[in-house]
């Protein structure tokens, strides 16, 4: 088996802002596995707060590249297990290799992944389209640019309720909210009570990941699923 890789800095169509900051590009690693002339592709993004940049993925991959190329590829699950032990501290790289392994296996068997897994895609849940924090008129324009049945709206500002109030005027689609840990418990409850009357379906990551007491408080009182 042969392996190739390439790094990209993918430019977003629009700047993407959440409560932690703004991104205009996404650093990404693409890997290619080739086995008897058939190629499979996988990718992994670099997310800053996980401290695993693309450069680290490449460095780790280079140190064990020969082991991957010597692997006798017959089963993607076995390949994942092998990669998991090769790179125990780099789950993003393992993910890219795992995706490439499944893509390769599907092409070898001439089957789509859902066929390999025995899935009925007619029952797939609908994914949401994410809109980052911006001036509210820009957020409205993004909704109009991409009509969608479910929107995830990034929040974490002093004007969160006003933003959702305005967006609701322009769509009847389901709205989900992701605060990316921007709120405190009391603030979150106040906002969630307002969102309940604006047709919001659920709230994602309202509080800091280690605020267990706040989550306990909010879970008992929130009128919306968390």
Predicted ranges, named:
Residues 1-50:
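Structured beta-strand/loop patches that form or line metal/cofactor-binding pockets in enzymes
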Residues 31, 37, 97, 110, ...:
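Conserved, mostly hydrophobic/aromatic
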Residues 33-34, 39-108:
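Metal- or metallocofactor-binding catalytic centers and their adjacent structured scaffolds
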Residues 76, 113-114, 202-206:
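Flexible, glycine/charged-enriched surface loops at secondary-structure junctions
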Residues 105-129:
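Catalytic pocket of metal/acid-base enzymes, prominently hydrolases
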Residues 123-135, 154, 180-184:
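Active-site mouth loops of central-metabolism enzymes
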Residues 132-146, 158, 186-190:
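Short, acidic/polar
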Residues 153, 158-226:
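Catalytic core of soluble alpha/beta enzymes
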């Amino acid at each position: 088996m042969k392996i190739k890789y390439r790094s990209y800095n993918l430019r977003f169509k629009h700047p993407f802002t959440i409560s932690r900051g703004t991104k205009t590009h996404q650093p990404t690693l693409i890997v290619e596995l080739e086995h008897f002339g058939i190629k499979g592709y996988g990718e992994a993004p670099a997310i800053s707060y996980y401290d695993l940049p693309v450069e680290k993925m490449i460095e780790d991959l280079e140190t064990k590249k020969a082991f991957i190329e010597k692997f006798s590829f017959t089963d993607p699950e076995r390949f994942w297990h092998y990669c998991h032990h090769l790179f125990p501290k780099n789950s993003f790289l393992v993910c890219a290799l795992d995706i490439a392994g499944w893509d390769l296996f599907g092409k070898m068997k001439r089957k789509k992944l859902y066929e390999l897994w025995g899935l009925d895609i007619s029952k797939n849940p609908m994914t949401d389209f994410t809109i980052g924090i911006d001036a509210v008129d820009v957020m409205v324009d993004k909704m109009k640019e991409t009509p969608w049945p479910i929107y995830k709206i990034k929040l974490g500002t002093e004007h969160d309720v006003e933003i959702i109030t305005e967006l609701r005027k322009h769509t009847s689609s389901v709205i989900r909210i992701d605060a990316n840990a921007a709120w405190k418990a009391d603030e979150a409850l106040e906002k969630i009570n307002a969102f309940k009357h604006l047709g919001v379906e659920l709230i994602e990551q309202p509080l800091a990941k280690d605020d267990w007491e706040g989550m306990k408080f909010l879970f008992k009182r929130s009128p919306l699923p968390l």
